[in-house]
Amino acid sequence: MEAIKGSDVNVPDAVFAWLLDGRGGVKPLEDNDVIDSQHPCWLHLNYTHPDSARWLASTPLLPNNVRDALAGESSRPRVSRMGEGTLITLRCINGSTDERPDQLVAMRLYMDERFIVSTRQRKVLALDDVVSDLQEGTGPVDCGGWLVDVCDALTDHASEFIEELHDKIIDLEDNLLDQQIPPRGFLALLRKQLIVMRRYMAPQRDVYARLASERLPWMSDDHRRRMQDIADRLGRGLDEIDACIARTGIMADEIAQVMQESLARRTYTMSLMAMVFLPSTFLTGLFGVNLGGIPGGGWRFGFSLFCILLVVLIGGVTLWLHRSKWL
């Protein structure tokens, strides 16, 4: 493949444009640099920036059917070979487990053995690990190593997020054993996050597996082996997600049962109170009719005797309920 001039990929508002030095480090790309397989270029763009959008729409370095995909038209993880290059769409985790499940950020990239063009709108936090390694001189030396390191960083972030969700489920299960109900919406958010993760990480695992099996010229056998390991690791994470989704379903049933039992206890208590006070209510209503005068109204001990009668009646009903094992 022909070499590319640095001026051909000069985008003023690029997030960064670096030239890999072939020894694990990078340097800022300059117009007189020569880009080839020994010194590939990494151009990282925000496709919403005007200069980046114009470059994506006009550069001859990109196939026509790649431009729309890099400009944000593609969202689900996938991989497509485009002649000598490859178009890859990946998803990564941004944010924490307390946020709504919209923290999956899309990253789109087109690459061959000479240069890498990656685009995003929101910042991709997983790339910070790769950027840090390159700045320290311990990063990838070629395009194949770069792709493996990026996929490894994305999977690390996904695995950490899945582990955090798993810990929350364990805490929730422990609380349910103590009859503690989680706040409203907590379990629904947790389940939604798991479902969204499952939706995007399953095709991403397939992307990794395909990259491991494709005979891409810029990926060595070691790169393919590492990529297969990454796919297997993400597959284990998906198995964990499936188990967590099943456990949230069981917890939802358990929460419903706990709430139903609590409501039944309250209803039972109110029914017993009604049974205890029903006879006394009947007597007070009967004596309060006052059609022929209140019985005992002219006797000074009448009210006291009536109160004693009510206490004895309530005690008798309570004793009967206790002997009947209703209390």
Swiss-Prot record:
Changes seen on gene knockout: Disruption of the gene has a marked effect on resistance levels to zinc and cadmium, but does not significantly alter the sensitivities to cobalt, nickel or manganese.
Impact reported for residue 92 to S: Contains only two zinc binding sites
Positions of transmembrane segments: 274-294, 301-321
Membrane topology: Multi-pass membrane protein
Keywords linked to the UniProt accession: Cell inner membrane, Cell membrane, Ion transport, Membrane, Metal-binding, Transmembrane, Transmembrane helix, Transport, Zinc
Catalytic function, reaction form: Zn(2+)(out) + H(+)(out) = Zn(2+)(in) + H(+)(in)
Pfam families in alphabetical order: CorA (PF01544)
Residue intervals on the Periplasmic side: 295-300
Sequence positions that bind Zn(2+) 1: 92, 157
MF terms (GO), sorted A to Z: cobalt ion binding; cobalt ion transmembrane transporter activity; identical protein binding; magnesium ion binding; magnesium ion transmembrane transporter activity; zinc ion transmembrane transporter activity
A GO term from the CC aspect: plasma membrane
Residues reported to bind Zn(2+) 3: 307
Subcellular location: Cell inner membrane
Subunit details: Homopentamer. Can assemble pentamers in the absence of the transmembrane regions.
Written domain comment of the UniProt record: Forms a funnel-like structure. Contains three Zn(2+) binding sites, two of which could be involved in Zn(2+) transport.
Family, per entry: Belongs to the CorA metal ion transporter (MIT) (TC 1.A.35) family.
Functional summary from the UniProt entry: Zinc transporter. Acts as a Zn(2+):proton symporter, which likely mediates zinc ion uptake.
More info: A role in zinc efflux has been proposed by Worlock et al, but ZntB was later shown in E.coli to likely mediate zinc uptake, using a transport mechanism that does not resemble the one proposed for homologous CorA channels.
Stated name of the protein: Zinc transport protein ZntB
Source species: Salmonella typhimurium (strain LT2 / SGSC1412 / ATCC 700720)
